[in-house]
A protein has these predicted regions:
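N-terminal Sec/SRP start-transfer signal
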Residues: 1-32
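ATP/adenylate-binding site constellation spanning eukaryotic-like Ser/Thr protein kinases
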Residues: 16, 58, 173
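Juxtamembrane alpha-helical signal-transduction segment immediately C-terminal to a transmembrane helix
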Residues: 24, 28, 37-41, 49-52
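Short aromatic/hydrophobic contact patches that present stacked aromatics
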Residues: 29, 62, 238-240
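Membrane-proximal extracellular/periplasmic loop immediately following the first transmembrane helix
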Residues: 43, 47-123, 130, 235
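Short beta-strand boundary microenvironments
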Residues: 92-179, 199, 220
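Mid-to-C-terminal secondary-structure elements
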Residues: 142-157, 167-261
Length: 261
């Protein structure tokens, strides 16, 4: 059988079974479209992640410390290692810019008629998250230095906020826009799971106007990590150390490795 005969037989088979052939062709088209959609979504997510990592800045070192200790009654008595790590890093200022816990919590944020629990999550065509409830972070007074953030209004978290368990917070530009509109948020009080927190500052937006890939990163609230005593939701096991440059990062890693031994 030559190629021409094989082609004729295949053609007669297709013509004789038009319905099945149409479904087969449709399935092929659907399969191709699905693959193209998946590839497009994956490429969009990859680009979004790269922009988000870039927005957080370079030379970040992740330090993980795990400690689970319980008393006879089952109460968690694990040691808080951050004060020791914080003090240790103060002696490494030649190499280290800052250090902070890297923790989050889930809570309902309310200001006026705005309520995070009723906010809907929305995505654009590139699957960038463009709206939704704010992400709630815990940090030290050096959180902004570790995450490439600058204060646009008010002030940053202070060391005394941590030490005195002050119920204050700094919010991102997108959170300020969604909850406060044109009103200056600095000095205003938000309720977080029923607890009053005063907004002391607003971080500058990290993305350009209209750039949805990092927009949701600015939909955030940062609390002193000691606020976890009233808000809960955090066992701090990960910490971020921000080095001055790549060479300093290697040196800092060596020193911190010695601290952890």
């Amino acid at each position: 059988m030559n190629i021409l005969q094989a082609f004729k037989m295949a053609w007669r088979s297709i013509i004789g079974k038009k319905g099945r052939s149409a479904l087969t062709i449709l399935s092929i088209f659907i399969g191709i479209a699905a693959v193209m959609t998946i590839v497009s979504v994956m490429e969009g997510m990859k680009a979004q992640m790269m922009k988000q990592f870039s927005a957080m800045g370079a030379n970040r070192v992740s330090v993980n410390i795990y400690s689970w200790m319980y008393d006879a009654d089952g109460n968690d008595v694990s040691k808080d290692y951050f004060p020791d790590l914080y003090e240790y890093c103060q002696g490494l200022k030649e190499y280290v810019i800052g250090v902070t816990p890297n923790g989050q919590t889930n809570a309902t944020v309310i200001y006026g008629t705005k309520n995070s629990s009723t906010m809907e999550t929305e995505y654009d065509k590139q699957w960038n998250l463009i709206s939704g409830p704010p992400t709630l972070y815990y940090g030290s007074d050096q959180y902004s230095a570790c995450n490439n953030l600058t204060v646009a209004k008010g002030r940053d978290l202070a060391y005394l906020d941590i030490q005195n368990y002050n119920q204050v917070c700094v919010i991102g530009a997108e959170m300020a826009k969604q909850f406060f509109g044109t009103v200056d948020p600095v000095g205003k009080t938000i309720k977080v799971n029923g607890n009053n927190f005063t907004v002391v500052g607003v971080y500058a937006a990290r993305g350009e106007e209209g750039d949805n890939s990092v927009k949701q990163m600015d939909n955030m609230v940062v609390f002193p990590y000691t606020a976890s005593r009233v808000l809960g939701g955090a066992r701090f096991t990960e910490y971020i150390v921000k080095a001055r440059d790549s060479e300093s990062a290697n040196t800092a890693i060596a020193y911190i490795g010695g601290f952890l031994k």
